[in-house]
Protein backbone atom coordinates (compact mmCIF):
# COMPACT_ATOMS: atom_id res chain seq x y z
CA UNK A 1 0.00 0.00 0.00
CA UNK A 2 1.36 3.41 -0.97
CA UNK A 3 1.95 5.78 1.93
CA UNK A 4 0.38 9.22 1.96
CA UNK A 5 2.64 12.26 1.66
CA UNK A 6 2.04 13.13 5.32
CA UNK A 7 3.02 9.59 6.38
CA UNK A 8 6.16 9.76 4.25
CA UNK A 9 7.07 13.11 5.82
CA UNK A 10 6.52 11.68 9.31
CA UNK A 11 8.77 8.70 8.55
CA UNK A 12 11.51 11.00 7.25
CA UNK A 13 11.20 13.19 10.35
CA UNK A 14 11.54 10.11 12.59
CA UNK A 15 14.66 9.11 10.64
CA UNK A 16 16.17 12.57 11.06
CA UNK A 17 15.29 12.54 14.78
CA UNK A 18 17.03 9.19 15.20
CA UNK A 19 20.07 10.50 13.37
CA UNK A 20 20.10 13.60 15.59
CA UNK A 21 20.32 11.40 18.68
CA UNK A 22 23.48 9.76 17.36
CA UNK A 23 25.04 12.90 15.97
CA UNK A 24 26.68 15.75 17.85
CA UNK A 25 26.45 18.82 15.62
CA UNK A 26 28.90 20.60 17.88
CA UNK A 27 31.69 18.33 16.64
CA UNK A 28 31.84 20.13 13.30
CA UNK A 29 32.86 23.75 12.82
CA UNK A 30 29.90 24.51 10.54
CA UNK A 31 27.28 23.20 12.94
CA UNK A 32 28.68 25.08 15.91
CA UNK A 33 26.99 28.10 14.30
CA UNK A 34 23.54 26.53 14.40
CA UNK A 35 20.88 28.12 16.63
CA UNK A 36 19.37 25.79 19.23
CA UNK A 37 15.77 27.05 19.00
CA UNK A 38 12.89 24.68 18.37
CA UNK A 39 11.73 26.69 15.36
CA UNK A 40 15.16 26.50 13.71
CA UNK A 41 15.41 22.78 14.37
CA UNK A 42 12.04 22.24 12.66
CA UNK A 43 13.14 24.36 9.70
CA UNK A 44 16.42 22.48 9.38
CA UNK A 45 14.69 19.09 9.52
CA UNK A 46 12.19 20.18 6.88
CA UNK A 47 14.96 21.26 4.52
CA UNK A 48 16.94 18.06 5.14
CA UNK A 49 13.83 16.02 4.44
CA UNK A 50 13.21 17.89 1.18
CA UNK A 51 16.80 17.40 0.03
CA UNK A 52 16.58 13.67 0.74
CA UNK A 53 13.25 13.57 -1.08
CA UNK A 54 14.99 14.98 -4.15
CA UNK A 55 17.87 12.51 -3.75
CA UNK A 56 15.49 9.56 -3.66
CA UNK A 57 12.92 10.76 -6.18
CA UNK A 58 15.41 11.62 -8.91
CA UNK A 59 18.14 9.08 -8.19
CA UNK A 60 20.70 11.79 -7.51
CA UNK A 61 23.07 9.51 -5.60
CA UNK A 62 23.17 6.82 -8.25
CA UNK A 63 26.75 6.42 -9.46
CA UNK A 64 27.88 9.63 -7.74
CA UNK A 65 31.34 9.86 -6.19
CA UNK A 66 32.37 13.51 -6.28
CA UNK A 67 30.26 16.66 -6.58
CA UNK A 68 31.22 20.21 -7.46
CA UNK A 69 28.89 22.47 -5.46
CA UNK A 70 28.45 25.93 -6.94
CA UNK A 71 28.65 28.60 -4.23
CA UNK A 72 27.89 32.14 -5.38
CA UNK A 73 27.79 33.80 -1.98
CA UNK A 74 23.98 34.03 -1.99
CA UNK A 75 21.57 32.55 0.53
CA UNK A 76 20.57 29.60 -1.64
CA UNK A 77 24.01 28.23 -2.42
CA UNK A 78 25.23 28.74 1.15
CA UNK A 79 22.19 26.83 2.42
CA UNK A 80 22.70 24.08 -0.15
CA UNK A 81 26.31 23.56 0.92
CA UNK A 82 25.39 23.53 4.62
CA UNK A 83 22.61 20.97 4.12
CA UNK A 84 24.85 18.73 2.02
CA UNK A 85 27.59 18.94 4.65
CA UNK A 86 25.00 18.17 7.33
CA UNK A 87 23.94 14.99 5.52
CA UNK A 88 27.51 14.01 4.73
CA UNK A 89 28.58 14.43 8.36
CA UNK A 90 25.78 12.03 9.33
CA UNK A 91 26.96 9.43 6.82
CA UNK A 92 23.87 9.93 4.66
CA UNK A 93 25.70 11.39 1.67
CA UNK A 94 28.51 9.07 0.49
CA UNK A 95 29.87 11.65 -1.94
CA UNK A 96 32.96 13.86 -1.84
CA UNK A 97 32.07 17.56 -1.89
CA UNK A 98 34.10 20.35 -3.49
CA UNK A 99 32.72 23.87 -3.06
CA UNK A 100 33.47 26.20 -5.96
CA UNK A 101 33.04 29.92 -6.43
CA UNK A 102 33.49 31.58 -9.80
CA UNK A 103 34.71 35.14 -9.32
CA UNK A 104 33.30 36.78 -12.47
CA UNK A 105 35.20 40.03 -12.14
CA UNK A 106 32.37 42.20 -10.87
CA UNK A 107 33.52 45.58 -9.53
CA UNK A 108 33.98 45.70 -5.76
CA UNK A 109 33.50 41.94 -5.39
CA UNK A 110 34.78 41.09 -1.87
CA UNK A 111 37.35 38.47 -2.80
CA UNK A 112 38.22 37.43 0.76
CA UNK A 113 34.74 36.52 2.04
CA UNK A 114 34.19 33.14 0.39
CA UNK A 115 37.74 31.77 0.73
CA UNK A 116 37.78 32.75 4.41
CA UNK A 117 34.35 31.30 5.10
CA UNK A 118 34.90 28.02 3.22
CA UNK A 119 38.23 27.52 4.97
CA UNK A 120 36.60 28.22 8.35
CA UNK A 121 34.07 25.38 7.91
CA UNK A 122 36.65 22.90 6.69
CA UNK A 123 35.28 22.11 3.24
CA UNK A 124 37.50 21.46 0.25
CA UNK A 125 37.06 24.38 -2.12
CA UNK A 126 38.28 26.10 -5.24
CA UNK A 127 38.03 29.79 -6.11
CA UNK A 128 38.30 30.49 -9.85
CA UNK A 129 38.68 33.92 -11.45
CA UNK A 130 37.20 34.51 -14.91
CA UNK A 131 36.25 38.02 -16.04
CA UNK A 132 32.87 37.20 -17.58
CA UNK A 133 31.55 40.54 -16.27
CA UNK A 134 33.38 42.48 -19.01
CA UNK A 135 32.13 40.08 -21.68
CA UNK A 136 28.53 40.47 -20.54
CA UNK A 137 28.77 44.26 -20.39
CA UNK A 138 30.28 44.33 -23.89
CA UNK A 139 27.90 41.90 -25.59
CA UNK A 140 24.54 42.78 -24.02
CA UNK A 141 22.83 45.95 -25.35
CA UNK A 142 22.00 48.75 -22.93
CA UNK A 143 18.67 48.09 -21.24
CA UNK A 144 18.66 44.35 -21.98
CA UNK A 145 18.98 41.77 -19.22
CA UNK A 146 22.31 40.17 -18.44
CA UNK A 147 20.99 36.98 -16.85
CA UNK A 148 20.98 34.63 -19.85
CA UNK A 149 24.51 35.31 -21.11
CA UNK A 150 25.92 35.59 -17.59
CA UNK A 151 24.40 32.21 -16.70
CA UNK A 152 25.74 30.51 -19.84
CA UNK A 153 29.26 31.81 -19.28
CA UNK A 154 29.18 30.79 -15.63
CA UNK A 155 27.82 27.33 -16.43
CA UNK A 156 30.49 26.69 -19.06
CA UNK A 157 33.24 27.55 -16.60
CA UNK A 158 31.71 25.39 -13.87
CA UNK A 159 31.56 22.44 -16.29
CA UNK A 160 35.24 22.93 -17.04
CA UNK A 161 36.17 23.11 -13.37
CA UNK A 162 34.08 20.03 -12.57
CA UNK A 163 35.99 18.06 -15.21
CA UNK A 164 39.33 19.33 -13.95
CA UNK A 165 38.43 18.25 -10.41
CA UNK A 166 37.26 14.80 -11.53
CA UNK A 167 33.64 15.41 -10.53
CA UNK A 168 30.70 13.52 -11.99
CA UNK A 169 28.08 16.13 -11.08
CA UNK A 170 27.62 19.88 -10.81
CA UNK A 171 25.28 20.72 -7.93
CA UNK A 172 23.32 23.99 -8.00
CA UNK A 173 21.14 25.82 -5.49
CA UNK A 174 17.97 26.42 -7.50
CA UNK A 175 14.83 26.04 -5.37
CA UNK A 176 11.06 25.67 -5.75
CA UNK A 177 10.47 29.28 -6.79
CA UNK A 178 13.26 29.20 -9.38
CA UNK A 179 11.66 26.15 -10.97
CA UNK A 180 8.15 27.62 -11.01
CA UNK A 181 9.35 31.00 -12.30
CA UNK A 182 11.23 29.29 -15.13
CA UNK A 183 8.16 27.25 -16.02
CA UNK A 184 5.97 30.34 -16.32
CA UNK A 185 8.63 32.28 -18.21
CA UNK A 186 8.69 29.50 -20.80
CA UNK A 187 4.89 29.27 -20.70
CA UNK A 188 4.20 32.99 -21.21
CA UNK A 189 7.20 34.07 -23.27
CA UNK A 190 8.52 30.91 -24.93
CA UNK A 191 5.29 29.13 -25.81
CA UNK A 192 6.44 25.82 -24.35
CA UNK A 193 6.01 23.70 -21.24
CA UNK A 194 9.46 23.38 -19.69
CA UNK A 195 11.24 24.25 -16.48
CA UNK A 196 14.52 23.52 -14.67
CA UNK A 197 14.98 19.75 -14.31
CA UNK A 198 16.01 18.41 -10.93
CA UNK A 199 18.51 16.15 -12.69
CA UNK A 200 20.00 16.71 -16.14
CA UNK A 201 22.73 15.12 -18.24
CA UNK A 202 24.78 17.77 -20.04
CA UNK A 203 25.05 17.81 -23.84
CA UNK A 204 28.46 16.13 -23.78
CA UNK A 205 27.11 13.32 -21.61
CA UNK A 206 29.92 13.43 -19.06
CA UNK A 207 28.40 15.51 -16.26
CA UNK A 208 25.10 15.51 -14.41
CA UNK A 209 23.50 18.73 -13.16
CA UNK A 210 21.69 18.26 -9.85
CA UNK A 211 19.28 20.55 -8.00
CA UNK A 212 18.73 19.06 -4.52
CA UNK A 213 16.72 22.11 -3.36
CA UNK A 214 13.95 21.40 -5.90
CA UNK A 215 11.34 20.99 -3.13
CA UNK A 216 12.70 23.73 -0.84
CA UNK A 217 10.83 27.03 -0.50
CA UNK A 218 12.78 30.24 -0.99
CA UNK A 219 11.36 31.73 2.23
CA UNK A 220 12.65 28.73 4.19
CA UNK A 221 16.11 29.10 2.68
CA UNK A 222 16.13 32.81 3.52
CA UNK A 223 15.23 32.04 7.15
CA UNK A 224 17.85 29.29 7.31
CA UNK A 225 20.56 31.53 5.87
CA UNK A 226 19.71 34.37 8.24
CA UNK A 227 19.78 32.07 11.27
CA UNK A 228 23.12 30.60 10.20
CA UNK A 229 24.51 34.12 9.64
CA UNK A 230 26.08 33.28 6.30
CA UNK A 231 28.26 36.11 4.91
CA UNK A 232 25.96 37.01 2.01
CA UNK A 233 27.48 38.64 -1.08
CA UNK A 234 24.93 40.60 -3.18
CA UNK A 235 24.94 40.27 -6.97
CA UNK A 236 25.48 43.81 -8.24
CA UNK A 237 25.26 42.68 -11.86
CA UNK A 238 21.84 41.03 -11.98
CA UNK A 239 20.37 42.30 -8.73
CA UNK A 240 20.63 45.91 -9.89
CA UNK A 241 18.32 45.36 -12.85
CA UNK A 242 14.62 46.05 -12.38
CA UNK A 243 11.72 44.85 -14.49
CA UNK A 244 13.15 41.47 -15.41
CA UNK A 245 10.73 38.83 -16.68
CA UNK A 246 11.69 36.62 -13.75
CA UNK A 247 10.78 39.35 -11.27
CA UNK A 248 7.34 39.58 -12.88
CA UNK A 249 6.86 35.82 -12.51
CA UNK A 250 8.05 36.00 -8.89
CA UNK A 251 5.51 38.74 -8.12
CA UNK A 252 2.74 36.78 -9.84
CA UNK A 253 3.49 33.62 -7.86
CA UNK A 254 3.73 35.56 -4.60
CA UNK A 255 0.31 37.10 -5.26
CA UNK A 256 -1.22 33.70 -6.01
CA UNK A 257 0.29 32.22 -2.85
CA UNK A 258 -0.97 35.16 -0.79
CA UNK A 259 -4.53 34.76 -2.07
CA UNK A 260 -4.51 30.95 -2.13
CA UNK A 261 -1.95 29.56 0.33
CA UNK A 262 -0.35 26.29 -0.71
CA UNK A 263 -0.68 26.88 -4.46
CA UNK A 264 3.10 26.89 -5.02
CA UNK A 265 3.39 23.36 -3.69
CA UNK A 266 0.40 22.34 -5.79
CA UNK A 267 1.98 23.79 -8.93
CA UNK A 268 5.27 22.03 -8.20
CA UNK A 269 3.44 18.72 -7.78
CA UNK A 270 1.71 19.34 -11.11
CA UNK A 271 5.10 19.39 -12.85
CA UNK A 272 5.55 15.81 -11.69
CA UNK A 273 2.11 14.63 -12.84
CA UNK A 274 2.02 15.11 -16.62
CA UNK A 275 -0.65 13.48 -18.78
CA UNK A 276 0.59 13.66 -22.42
CA UNK A 277 -2.74 12.51 -23.87
CA UNK A 278 -4.40 15.60 -22.39
CA UNK A 279 -1.95 18.04 -23.97
CA UNK A 280 -1.41 19.00 -27.62
CA UNK A 281 2.05 17.67 -28.46
CA UNK A 282 2.03 14.83 -31.03
CA UNK A 283 5.68 14.14 -30.21
CA UNK A 284 4.63 13.02 -26.74
CA UNK A 285 1.43 11.19 -27.64
CA UNK A 286 0.38 9.36 -30.81
CA UNK A 287 -2.91 11.03 -31.68
CA UNK A 288 -2.88 9.61 -35.24
CA UNK A 289 -3.42 6.01 -34.17
CA UNK A 290 -5.73 6.87 -31.32
CA UNK A 291 -8.29 4.14 -30.71
CA UNK A 292 -10.91 3.49 -28.05
CA UNK A 293 -9.60 1.83 -24.95
CA UNK A 294 -10.76 -1.79 -24.65
CA UNK A 295 -13.81 -2.26 -22.48
CA UNK A 296 -13.63 -4.67 -19.60
UniProtKB/Swiss-Prot annotation:
Pathway(s) it belongs to: tRNA modification
A Pfam family hit: ATP_bind_3
Cofactor(s) in the UniProt record: Mg(2+); [4Fe-4S] cluster
MF-aspect GO terms: 4 iron, 4 sulfur cluster binding; ATP binding; magnesium ion binding; sulfurtransferase activity; tRNA binding
Cofactor annotation remark: Binds 1 [4Fe-4S] cluster per subunit. The cluster is chelated by three Cys residues, the fourth Fe has a free coordination site that may bind a sulfur atom transferred from the persulfide of IscS.
Motif (PP-loop motif): 72-77
Chemical reaction(s) catalysed: cytidine(32) in tRNA + S-sulfanyl-L-cysteinyl-[cysteine desulfurase] + AH2 + ATP = 2-thiocytidine(32) in tRNA + L-cysteinyl-[cysteine desulfurase] + A + AMP + diphosphate + H(+)
Cellular localization per UniProt: Cytoplasm
The keyword rRNA-binding belongs to this UniProt entry's keyword annotation: no
Enzyme Commission number(s) from the entry: 2.8.1.-
Coiled-coil region list: none
One of the GO BP terms on file: tRNA thio-modification
Keyword ATP-binding in annotation: yes
Keywords, sorted A to Z: 4Fe-4S, ATP-binding, Cytoplasm, Iron, Iron-sulfur, Magnesium, Metal-binding, Nucleotide-binding, RNA-binding, Transferase, tRNA processing, tRNA-binding
Extra information: The thiolation reaction likely consists of two steps: a first activation step by ATP to form an adenylated intermediate of the target base of tRNA, and a second nucleophilic substitution step of the sulfur (S) atom supplied by the hydrosulfide attached to the Fe-S cluster.
Family membership: Belongs to the TtcA family.
Subunit details: Homodimer.
Biological role stated in the UniProt entry: Catalyzes the ATP-dependent 2-thiolation of cytidine in position 32 of tRNA, to form 2-thiocytidine (s(2)C32). The sulfur atoms are provided by the cysteine/cysteine desulfurase (IscS) system.
NCBIfam families: PRK10696.1
Official protein name in the record: tRNA-cytidine(32) 2-sulfurtransferase
Organism for this UniProt entry: Sinorhizobium fredii (strain NBRC 101917 / NGR234)
Amino acid sequence: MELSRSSQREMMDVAVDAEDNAFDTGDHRLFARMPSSVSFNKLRKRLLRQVRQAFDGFGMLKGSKRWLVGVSGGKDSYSLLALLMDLKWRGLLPVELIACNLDQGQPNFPKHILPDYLASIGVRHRIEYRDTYSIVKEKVPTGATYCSLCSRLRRGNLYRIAREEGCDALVLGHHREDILETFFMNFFHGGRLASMPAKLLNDEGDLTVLRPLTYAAEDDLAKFAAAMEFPIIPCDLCGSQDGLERNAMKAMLADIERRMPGRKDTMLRALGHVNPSHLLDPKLFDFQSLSPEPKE
